Amino acid sequence: MNIGKKAHWEKVYETKEPHEVSWTQDVPKTSLEMIHSFPIDRSAKIIDIGGGDSTLVDFLLEQGFENITVLDISAKALEKGKARLGDRAQLITWIVSDITQFQPETTYDIWHDRAVFHFLTEQEQIEKYLNIARKAAVGYLTIGTFSENGSEKCSGLAIKQYTEETLSSVFAADFETLTSKRENHI
């Protein structure tokens, strides 16, 4: 596990509340729309990569999804998510892992990531991610990144920007682009 990145994210989640970080969404509308656009049932296996303290899991539970996994490099982020969910947290599989070191024990019908991929700035990291996704994402993969017009940093870390075309080309060998959407991150 990349100790520098892990320490960074542990500090963020130890010192910041959800309203103090730019990525917090009260309602993860776009993610929910994407997930609902796929022909799946409520027993579909869904993994939220970098989901930490995201409320996506809350909405998925409320909508009856039964097989949800949340993966994050930050144990503190996952603790916050568990605390927010209370007793419902036991319905979720929680995994503390750097995505580039993740060793999935199952496959997923939906691989959702609006928080991690853009932080992979080196080709080796991207290749590791692709190898893991190739094995574990057997249904649909939905990725959110910063566009070429977006920020060059997030939470003080460098990110990699993508156009719809460049992001599609990264995944083209293993995944077909079904749709793309632009959304402004303010």
Please name every model-derived segment.
Residues M1-T106, L120-I186:
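Class I (Rossmann-like) S-adenosyl-L-methionine-dependent methyltransferase catalytic domain
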Residues H112:
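A conserved beta-strand element that flanks and buttresses the S-adenosyl-L-methionine
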